[in-house]
Amino acid sequence: GENGHIQFLSKGRAVTYSKEDARFQDNVYGAWWDSGDYGCMTPEGTLLLKDRQVDLIEHIDSNLALEDVLLEKLDFLSEVVIIRDVNGAPQPIIALADDAEMNWEAWWAMVADLPLLKEPILMAYDDIPRTATMKVQCLKMEAEMKEKNL
């Protein structure tokens, strides 16, 4: 299917965001609500979540899928996050699994046939900023990279 914003028509949706009604109303289109997610419907009717709209990177179909593949195939990693660098290019941020060492040969072999990624930045798992629900704060990481001109 065609990629696009995921919108819902539901009696069970929220009516506002706490203390952020204007931001909520910006995402309401009549009876429809824009979830902030991005994806597509398969011909069989399955909804595929690809990314948050704010996290989209040009030439990457799905950051989430790419991160999942890298985590699944490279057992020395405990986290993979792909954010935009200051020029909008895909910048992997990776954390190593406990007691693991970076296997550069395996990394470069794995990403050779993927969309062009910059050399990953290694971070400790606990240093990757997260929300209270453990979601990685990609926009915060991008802002920090911009401050450091990385």
Where do the model's predicted regions map?
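Conserved ATP/PPi-binding loop(s) of AMP-dependent carboxylate-activating enzymes
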Residues: G1-Y29, H59-D61
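Structural signal for glycine-centered tight turns and loop->strand junctions in beta-sheet-rich domains
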Residues: E2-G4, A31, G45, G88
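AMP-binding/adenylate-forming catalytic core of the ANL superfamily
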Residues: S10, T16, G36-L116, P129, ...
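Short loop/turn motifs at secondary-structure junctions and domain boundaries
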Residues: G30-A31, K118-I121
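Short, small/polar residue-rich loop motifs at catalytic or cofactor-binding pockets
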Residues: W33-S35, M123-A124
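A short, polar/charged loop-to-alpha-helix boundary motif
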Residues: I60, M145-L150
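Flexible lysine-rich "adenylation lid" loop at the C-terminal edge of ANL adenylation domains
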Residues: Y125-E147
